[in-house]
Amino acid sequence: MTPTLNSRLRLGGSLATLALSSFVVPAIAQDQAAPVTTTTPSAVDQPPVADIVVTGSLIARPNNVAVSPIVTVSSELVQQSGQITLEDSLNQLPGFTPSGNAGTGGQGAGGRATLNLRGLGSNRNLVLLDGRRLPLSDINGNVDINILPESIIGSVDVITGGASAIYGSDAMSGVVNFKTDRYFDGVRVDIQNGDSFRGDYGKFNASLALGTKFAGDRGRLMLALSYGKRDPLSGSQRDFFADKVPSSFIGTGAFVPDALNLPSQAALNGVFAQYGVTTPINRTLNLGFNNNGSLFAQTGAINYQGPTSDGYAVVGGNVRMPVGPQLQILNAFERKSAFAKGEFDLTESLTAYGQFLYVDSTVTTESGGSLTQFAPFTTIPVTNPHIPTDLRTLLASRADPTAPFRWSGRYVGIGDKGWDENYRVQQYLGGLKGTISGSWKFDAFVSYDETIHSQSMFNAVLKSRVQTLLNAADGGASLCAGGFNPFGITNATSLSQECQNYMTATVQSRERLAQTQAQGQVNGALFDLPAGPVQLALLAGYRKNTYKYDPSPDLVSNNVESVVGSNPARGEISVKEFAAQIDVPLLSDTPFFHELGVGAAFRYSDYNPTGSVKSYEFDARWQPVQALLIRGSYQRAVRAPNIGELFSPVTGSQLAIGTPPAAIGDPCDIRSTARTGINGAQVRGLCLAQGIPAAAIDAYQFATTATGGNIQGNNALTPEKANTFNVGFVFNPKFSTPWLSGFSFSVDYYNIKIRNVISTINGLTVLAKCYNLDGSNSGYSNSNEFCQLIQRDPTGQLVAIAQPYLNLGALDTDGVDVQVNWSLKLSDAGIGDGSGKIYASSAIGWLNHYKVQTLPGTASQDFVGTSTPGRPLPKWKALTTVGYSSDVFGVGLRWRYQGKLRDISAVTSPAAEQVGVKPYNLFDIFSTLDINDNLQLRGGITNLFDKGIPFVASSQNGTDPGTYDMVGRSFYVGAKFKF
């Protein structure tokens, strides 16, 4: 954290203000900029509007009734959450599952943030701005919502149901439509500061918005500038991470025996006898190096002489290096953005409009020291002068005593590896809209956007340079001062600066995505029925996306430690579309039929290269009385494979599998429940078939806690298809008694069934299914499709698990959303003579099922109520707000609730189920104070009771930073000016 930011926060901390509540409201009605209200708005309560737009429909219905379940989030709700990024505010709602965000992304995330409706994936919901697609932020079709300056947002509409027939591919789980604020005259300034109560996580945000009307109000213009900054939070700043991520890649270095060229048992016993060890040592296991040159068995910590602090520990009897303190839990983040939109009435019936968006964001991510994880592995020749005497004895006892040996370790003498990422987005849009004749209107636009992601990896250890030093007859001393001695922690940390410079480099890569869009739409009334006009909308569009990836030569040659190599890649997809929607009012203003109507929509999309698809929708609405709306819809939704799924290069990452039997680990490990269980003989046979040498099979232990996971595109993919069903009601009774006049609630049931799912297979799932931990491979056959994804080296060690994109099985989920609102004007109830009111609002989500069928014909597994890293699926989730507000002051309390969760291992490997997570509750307080008509102060405290970080057993870092609060109790203060 910079001193400047610290000083700003200390000064700002003297403001004792908190934020006015606003509401998440289910919509019977939606208008272009829904006001903050405490009740469900209805068509009767709002005056007629000439040009109504309803999110989720191509038709502007005169009665302003929304058939799709829609939740509207006001801009005030975003502000009172105390966050400086939009996704942190929206992810508090039950319908969202925390996904990638600007703080928790690792390599390649670029400070980007995505939204994930229903836990179905961030690329299965569509994110729009004023009903139009936003620039893509990555090759997987995701949209970074943090490219939107908060100062331009008037409200957010969230459709929690399929909408492919209306909006096209990607709208399987729903749509999030950000609506820009209405045009205005004047200047608006907003500033907000915040920090943790520990003073180690500063956040700052400022925005400036200018609006003007000109040429006799025929022209309207809005300009917004925004700046946001957030400090990093490392694992060393939270005690929770002190012992987390116990890595088997340790700073002392380790000798990795070759199963086909093992040291003799006699030599090994003799060396350890010198240390007073009489128990035979498993000669297939890694041996580490003490500072005095003696050896220790990493498994069992036999003869380990320390250290046992400063990042070293004995975990489960094994020597490990907890790297949790080295990890950057929340990234540093800086964003600058500019947005402009304007329109000009050329005639009374024709308006030209344009829009511009520019974003420049930078994030720095650090991930700890580099390690020797991915092939090709580092080897050391027997001629290296630094080899300790006892190790030389073992090397000489091998069948081939002159063969080089593999060295495993972590480069603790070099600074932590990290990434400086810059992410720039530009979008240009222009169009015409107007009236054709009567009720018939048109809107046509073209747009172009470009996203450039530049990445600089610093302190990248080059394998070729390390190998050159180790191969040198003098240990590399002639190449850099002192050379490289990797044996023992003291030697490893004594690396000269000259050698550090020799071994490392800054490695560059660059991604470019571009999108071109053209779309035209007409809509109007075909004819009138007694209940109202029959309306039709027609749409035609074209969209093209291109992608290009240029990696550094060191990445192409797989020359960077801890990083899987990647090749240049490029790809292109395009689509031509036609859509139609019709709305038919059947009855109105009759007994039991205040309104009855039906609608339908159809979309034809022709994708290059994956072919044509069709989607459609049928919906119905019935208001038996004015206060009650019953609604339902059925949709066939589609999602075509995106550029990343089709063309992405191999992308590798570390896949944590843990150490058996406490975790799944390598099932071939003799300590695993797979080997020790009733089917141990069958598992042993499968492990032999996979290449573990017979000489090593009965002593085989996987020495590390992680392996590689390699994701790659697949241009043979076909589109996903989904059937979605929604039914529910909204009740807004308008009781005459003041205690109930502000009461409303809604209940909606959703059911989504996706087939031909495009996805990668989780590496832990691959292991569980290959080794029949869940019954998927009862024959223990190595030809099983999951076993074919497992890669082992000639010694049998688990090198990587391939995770290509595939058309897999199915994904089925269903649940219920409930929204309850209540408010009371105190003066109406005879309490006081002021204009204040009290209110309560609760959004509740209940998840019934979340079933995943990995492959067609296989059994489904229900993950409801499980703690899946990056995708928690609680059965219950709720956001509840209570408070008081008046014309000048407001104060409230917010309760965020997430139900208990089982660990994912309860489903994937029940025999090795790990501990789950208890119910999680967070409380926030907030308030506003209006000094005058032009100045408002706000502030609040989040995580009021300083709730600690929960342990997530199956997560690589021991928790889920995207779901749980890593910071602890925090405060924010802000001010809004207008003039």
Tell me the role of every PLM-derived stretch:
Residues 162, 182, 193-197, 214-216, ...:
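Transmembrane beta-strands of outer-membrane beta-barrel pores
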Residues 755, 848-851, 895-907, 928-979:
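C-terminal beta-signal and adjacent terminal beta-strands/loops
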Residues 456-458, 462-464, 635, 648, ...:
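C-terminal beta-signal and terminal closure region of outer-membrane beta-barrel proteins
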Residues 88-94, 98-112, 132, 136-151, ...:
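Surface-exposed beta-strand-turn/loop segments characteristic
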Residues 46, 183-186, 199, 215-218, ...:
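Short loop/turn motifs that connect adjacent beta-strands in outer-membrane beta-barrel proteins
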Residues 2-81, 87-93, 207, 211-212, ...:
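N-terminal Sec signal peptide and the immediately downstream disordered periplasmic leader
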Residues 451, 458-462, 466, 569-658, ...:
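Structural signature of Gram-negative outer-membrane beta-barrels, strongest in the C-terminal barrel
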Residues 598, 742-905:
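Gram-negative outer-membrane beta-barrel transporters
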